[in-house]
Amino acid sequence: MRRSFARIACVLALCAFIEVLPASLRGAALEKINASYGAISGSMLPIWVTKEAKLFEKQGLELNLVYISGGPRAIMSLIGGSVQFVNHSGMPALEAYQRGADTALIASPMNQLEHSLVVQKNISSVEQLRGKILGMSTAGSLTDILLREGLRLNGIAEKDVTILPVGDLGARLSALQTGRLHGVIVAGVQTLTATKMGFKQLIDFSKLPIEISGSGILVRRAYVMRNQETTLKFLKAWIEGIYLVKTKPEFSLGVLRKYGATQDVEVLNSIYGHYKDKLDTKPIPLGRVAKSMFYLLSRTNPEIPSGNPEGFVDARFINQLESAGFFDEMNRQYGK
């Protein structure tokens, strides 16, 4: 009889042990989800690192990660249901929210501008931009909105320049090299790439009085409310990816080399150092940042419906993780 009880106790202990193992180690089927990222930029390093380190699998998720250039296209994919999570600037999703969509910002590790206007080396002042042709990614994108506002804050009206949608960073720099454009807007350490090519930084957007969510996690409320556990698993994986970026430089640089469209060691090290220092390991989305983004949208798009931009922010999932001790666990594992 005692042997039977001992056997039962062993089986129960084994079951309990298996239950606390990550899904990837239990042999459980992984839940398939789709996510997109919106830039070939160091701001996307956390989701790239999370993917390459198999942290999504650790949480029981099989992530199909795709690149979608341009905020409006990414948000159309989100609303249409082809992706469940979007890692992108919050601006296009906020505009969709103000127009009645159920989009929300649930995490944001960076809330400052990191863009620059780089120009041909014969342009030495903002005044010389009058009559020039400038490039951004796509109409209505973050680069479009910021370029127009940056010009306005520096005393240049939109009517005084021509602004063209050109495409991703490679297309913009190529157009600058051929002389088709006189200036383009770039982000983060892309400025270093441009200056190494002989171009000049004319406007540093980080000095403007504006906050934005530059690389947040965007969702549809209908999806996350139906799939709260999946959402928490996604955030756990992605946030651990932020910790990994900050503590594992060699691995992170290898990932950056794979995704970042450059093999230049100086550029890679500069990108890594820049984002390692700026990423917040507790990425709480903030209402004041939503208000700042709405201000930007309304400056360039006056007919956008007014309302409550703070309602775009949903911090419940980050707050749940904090209450459950997740951040304490990460700090113990990786060091605060």
Residue ranges, per PLM feature:
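Bacterial N-terminal signal peptides that target proteins for export
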Residues: 1-11
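Bacterial N-terminal signal peptides
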Residues: 9-20
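Sec/Tat signal peptide C-region and signal peptidase I cleavage site
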Residues: 21-29
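Short, glycine-/small- and polar/acidic-enriched structural segments
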Residues: 28-178, 182-188, 201-205, 210-211
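Pocket-lining segment of extracytoplasmic ligand-binding domains
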Residues: 91-92, 170-261
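Secondary-structure end/capping motifs
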Residues: 225-307
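Conserved C-terminal helix/tail region of periplasmic/extracytoplasmic solute-binding proteins
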Residues: 298-336
